[in-house]
Amino acid sequence: MAWSEIDEASRTWRIPAQRSKNGKAHLVHLSDPVWEIIQSLPRTSSLVFATSGGRNFQDFKKAKAALDRASGVTDWWLHDLRRTVVSGMARLGVPPHVADKILNHRSGTISGVAAVYQRHEFLAERKQALDAWSTHVAGVISGIKNTQKQI
């Protein structure tokens, strides 16, 4: 994530097509807690999350090992976080086609003629879903359980 990819006015991160899995540029809404974290970071490099040498962070194996030690949970993969988020969003009432757009998937939930003609990006719906997820995570962290659907 580069600072130049962040739009402060809209609080979004534009992932360039050359770095996305499906080759399409992707716009990600940055919820309030995420925005606060990003704004608290020093701008010592062109990258938002950089090593102390200012280079792109790449040692995910080492980071996962640290998370394993801290949590005591070891039987998981980083990719499981995507499944957890999408499953949690479903419980919050986020429609599958919106979750697909959040993950930048080519929609598996819209098929046939609709898949050919449907070009709406669901930006407002994605923002609402990510804000709802952010509220849910904050509740988990604080211990305050919110069981109501948010979308």
Label every model-predicted segment.
Residues 80-106:
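C-terminal catalytic core of tyrosine-transesterase DNA break-rejoin enzymes
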Residues 20-21, 34, 40-45, 51-55, ...:
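C-terminal secondary-structure termini that scaffold catalytic or DNA-interacting sites
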Residues 2, 85, 103, 117-121:
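A general structural motif at alpha-helix termini
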Residues 64, 93, 106-107, 137, ...:
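A generic secondary-structure signal for well-formed alpha-helical elements
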Residues 1-40, 105-115:
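Conserved tyrosine-mediated DNA breakage-rejoining catalytic core shared by Y-recombinases
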Residues 10, 19, 29-74, 85, ...:
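Active-site/catalytic core of tyrosine-dependent DNA strand-transfer enzymes
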Residues 78-79, 122:
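Residue-level marker of regulatory loop/turn positions in helix-turn-helix DNA-binding domains and
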